Amino acid sequence: MSSHKSTTKSSSSGSSMSLILGFSKSMEKGNYNFSKENKKNRSFGVLYAMIKGNTFPRILTIISLLIEFCQLSSFGFKQQYPWGGDAGYYLKRIMSPVSHPSNLVGYNGFTIFFWIVIGLLLLGFFNIWYVAYQFYRGKIANIWIIRTLRWFVSTTVAVLFIPIISLLLIGLDCDYSQGGILKTFSNDNIYCFKGANLSIAIVSIILIIVFSIVGFTSSATYYEYDTNVKSRFSKPHARFDVYILFVKLILALLNSLVDFSPWTTSIVYFILSITLVFGSIIILPYNNQRLNQVKSGFYTTVFWVSFMTLVTMGINDETTATTCYITIVGAFFAFPIGYFSNRFYYNWLSSKIDQLKLPTSSSTNDFNEITKNEKSKTGDSKEKESSSPSKVTWGKQPITLGSKRQIIFPFFQNKFVMSFFVEIMVRKLLRSSNGSNGDDGISSNSNESIEHANNLYQCGLQYFPNSDLLWMAYCNFLFTVRKDRHIGYAALEKLRRMKPSFDVRFFIYQRDKEREQIMDSDLRGPEHTGKIQDFVSYMEFKKLYYGAKRHHVKCLTYIKKFWGLLLHETVDLHRLSDLSGRIATTENKANESYERLLALNPNSVRVLRDYSQFLEEVVKDTESSYKLQKKAEAIEDIMSKSQTTDFKTIDIKNLDNSDTELDQVLKQESNAIQLAKIDADIERSGSKSGSSKSKDDSSESSSSSKGRRGKYKEFQQSNAINKLSWLMIGTTACCIIFLIVMLIVLRDLSVKHTHSYQGIISITDCASEAVSIAINLNTMQAISISAGSVAFPFEAAEAMITQYRKQNDRSLIIMKNIHDAIYWGEGDPTSYVGDNLSKLKSINGFDVFDIGSTIFSFEEFNRSSTLVDNKEMIDIYSTPSVNMTILVSPPGTNSTNYITVTQTYNAWKAGNSFYESALIANKMSVQDIKDRAVFDPDFKFIILNAPSNIPEMYMKIQQVYIKSLIDDINTTLDTMLYVWVAIFCFLIILGAVLFRPIVTKISREKIRTLVLFSLAPKDVVFKLSSKKIKMTSLDSGSERDNLFDTTDDDAADGIDNHEHLQVDERKKNDDIIDDGSIVNRSINFGSHRRPLMNSTNVLASTTTINRGTISNRLNEDHDKVPLIENSISNNNKGYGWDGKSKRNLNKKSLRSVLRRLHWSYVLAIFLLFGFITMGLWVTYSVVHDNTQSGYVLGKSCSRSLDSRIINYYIAELYTFDNDANENEALEAVLQLQSNHQSLPYLEDVRPLMEGSYGCWMLNKSNCITSDSIYYNDVSIGLDWLVDQYTKHSVSLVNTDPSLLSTSPELGWMQAIGSDVVFQGLDTATFTYFQYYLSQKDWATKVLTSVLAISCVLLLVIHLLLFRPFMNHLRIQHIHTLALLRLAPDDIRFMEVSDKVIDED
């Protein structure tokens, strides 16, 4: 009655995605056979590796949903929309970076961020290609590669799709009206398809296409369909997710490329938001209904934002924030509207189930009968229910695949009904019958509810027979809920024949893979009892299993080879030692692999049997072997009780519990050993390896298992290797500690260096303040002499002198504080500079405080500098070394003559005397200055000493200060060098004293053990060398060996490098042995680890071989195992020891190998020495370059001081007291010119010197304007200004005193020869200071990086070279001693004399 629906609705749910997913059919080729999927299903193999078991856990799903809501909402607050007021401004500022984080940085930041993201994307794409290529080669990629691939897909597609696409679109967002300039960075004039952005544009176009394909493909398959998985939110399909991704792509494209048309973007945003709301409500993507309601609430809020965006566009008023507030308030109402709309729709759709009507007839062909008892209890009630044809009956119906019977459901006859409605109704049936409203898990549903759901699916398939989405949901229901795998696989085959869409075909592929894992039950164990649940763990398990088998067979083969070498007439101990190491290596690897396998899945029968055989044949631990064997048999008994491969949870007990069925079986046997102990032993021994089961490379150390280590405790009597190991650890630790100490010392030295730069400037500024005080006093004297005339009244002079007196008061305080700071050893003299440099530091971000307002006490100084402790600094401050000129009072009171004398002061008292005299002179009244300044001792003390003696004193202090700094640095570096040489010598002595005896002891123990084996009777050697190798489950599943990348360190073996452990090759080798012609030598030597058997068990398990069957012995080269002579007469001399004659032993080659241990330690020491010496050399070169910078900075400071001294002498020319000294003035000019010409012309100083710097005045109002006659002198640059300054100074010195007042040079000096020159030179000094400070910071970073890298390198060398070497040595040494278990009892405890060991 509803067959007409099949044509109109056959693919109602799948057709909507055909355009997006149609391309995917070309990706899938071939059938779904696992054996061919590595060649024909590469695309699905990659997707399966990415998706299976990798969907977000519940909490991450909720977080991703919140992130998606924020990203979609942010499209309504783009810059093109006129959101008004402060609220609109902040909304656009906050919400826009959610989808465009690069908006927060400039073009350079965008470029860096862009290429970082591109690099990560390319790594992800390369990862995809690599996994696909490995599938193409028929191998499985590295487990960590697959894990990173899964992380890449989870984060980039599910969370970061919008930010990544938006970032790629920034480089394509062009404004063609301005010639194709990038809109986002229009101020930088970056062209889209020119210059630096061309590569960005091309890469963006390519990656948008590739990333979109990857995103859509993975989104279509990125979901958890199994409702029994409690850790994740399940959903039946992901087609709505594909549409959401499509919406995100459209919105990102429009808002990046069409943002010039806000009406277009806002309308599209509104339409897409509506579709998201209705889609989330109608499709109900998640099985968890509450999550569906939350999702609809979010999308309704996004719809509200899009609607208000349209309203804002219509109002177009950026002055009011009304729409912003309405949007924010309305969002709180939009969410519950969407939330409850979704809930109402779900309840309405679920209520339609009551219309379902079933036929009343029942059938005996029900496939899934419960039990006869259940039928007898429930039969009557069900017959009553089925008696009424008008009532919905849920009795047993004939269950056939895609039932042809007419199940009446009028609701499905409506045109608007879609096939996925069936699956939504089934959710309600399963959930309501169990009384659950929020959980999506249905594993505890009653059989009745499952039958109800099955009937509903049967009805849906009747109305929608060609809906691949409905068939997929039904298959999933049969597998996960009804657990009816037979009908499920039949339904899967029918779905396969329907040629379904891409996502459904991938579902089929997943089911095929899971079926293969279930069929591989001897690896997995019973269902739900193993731990192999996801694809990655399953692949890791299989890879480990085949690796364990390889190492197992190799170990047995090397044992045969070991005994075969003893058949030589001359026994080469080197080859025996080499084979013993190979035996130890392969045994250790096999043991570790088996333990990791049991940690992954303790109930795998095949692993239990193989490990049991390994323990019996190799380790000779019969007790543990028996326990594992009994456990495997018990598991097989339980598995054999099932009639099918469907091992349900109710049928299998937990095999690890003490009261399980398995334990009950074992307890019935009187001689059985309880499994709890072996499980505990396995858990204990494999705890470390099992906890890191995701690692693909097993550790080379036996320390990963305490249980295994205990098996060889009896062979660890010698602590020689432990001592050697601690010696290597101590050597590396000593070197690393030295580097860390050196790093701390150098960083402390860097801080001192920074403060020393500050101190150099401070000392010179102290002298500059002294000269400035003298200049002001000279000016005050000149003013007082001129005062009293009509043109210059006394009151005007008084005001001017008061102003100069205030300047001197501040200069005196600054000078006193600097003088005390240097003397007391101020640790951080950053603030102790003059006003000019203090302002420059403050402008450039230095933390400075005012030192010109008060004099600091002794306690207020940070007295942490060690430079003042230098001997020369102490001498200059404590011994008389500064010549000061003092005025001697004349003998007569009216005499105008005066004389001066020179007295010697120390620097501390000279500075204090200058300060005290200046303080007195500065307090003189105008009249006193006019009348008595010429004869005042304090006034003249300042005038006579300020231009020469005081600057000379402070320059001497500066030079000693710099020299003290260099001496301190050199002393520190020399100390580090001496300490390192001492450490190196100590390590060499330590090696000579301790290392050599330890190595000698190890060598002797190894030779002693091997000599014992050379004494084994030849009949025992024949038997052990001829033992046939056979594994109980070797051939099982071996055809899949080629699925795994089995490459390891076997390729490094130099002997018989042709073993790949193929089945045919193993059989061939075994056949050779059966013929009795050759000792099996086809197995490759390789790797390194663990021990073996005792002689009793070996002899008991060895097959006896008649001597007459031994083939003729052939001569072979030294590197091959020799053939055994076929017929050896009893009268002939037999190979192997006959117990009488002397054994021929070759010890030379072994001794040469053991001597290499000495050179290994020497190489280790020189490696450490090389890295540390390299770090020291870089440190010395960088620090040495920086030490010379103090002299350059001091010379720049001296230039500023010279300019002030020249200005002082020029001022004296018109003070009328005959104190002018032309010679000293010319010397000051020469000194200024010399310093100026000898300073390096740094790139940072070039703008200031050449005029491009602009005005350097601290107060910009004092800058020389272009209309000034002196503008050209200043605008050309400081270099020209200094040159003019020196020329004018020389000219003034040689000018007649009577013409000074009218000299143009004097006017030039008064206009720009003071503050303009002073501030320019101070700015140059600060520029030098900043440059060398940056160089020091760079040097500190270099030193830190070099030393830190050296520390890391030393640690890496120890971990990658020294530690593996010691572990390798320890394993081989211990296992060589453990080989004594192979020796017969009559030689096992023999004593070998030292003479035999020492002789060659």
Curated annotation (Swiss-Prot):
Entry's Gene Ontology BP terms: cell-cell fusion; RNA processing
Pfam families tied to this protein: TPR_TmcB (PF25474)
Entry keywords, A to Z: Membrane, Transmembrane, Transmembrane helix
Membrane topology value: Multi-pass membrane protein
Composition bias, Basic and acidic residues: 369-386
Cited Gene3D superfamilies: Tetratricopeptide repeat domain
Region (Disordered): 367-393, 683-712
GO CC terms: membrane
UniProt-listed InterPro entries: HAT, Tiny_macrocysts_regulators, TPR-like_helical_dom_sf
Subcellular location: Membrane
Source organism, top-level taxon: Eukaryota
Membrane spanning residue stretches: 59-79, 112-132, 152-172, 196-216, 240-260, 266-286, 296-316, 320-340, 726-746, 975-995, 1162-1182, 1342-1362
Primary location: membrane
SMART domains: HAT
Disruption phenotype: Null cells have increased numbers of peripheral cells during sexual development. Indistinguishable from the wild-type cells with respect to the cAMP response.
Matches recorded under PANTHER family: GAMETE ENRICHED GENE 10 PROTEIN-RELATED, TINY MACROCYSTS PROTEIN B-RELATED
Protein's UniProt name: Tiny macrocysts protein C
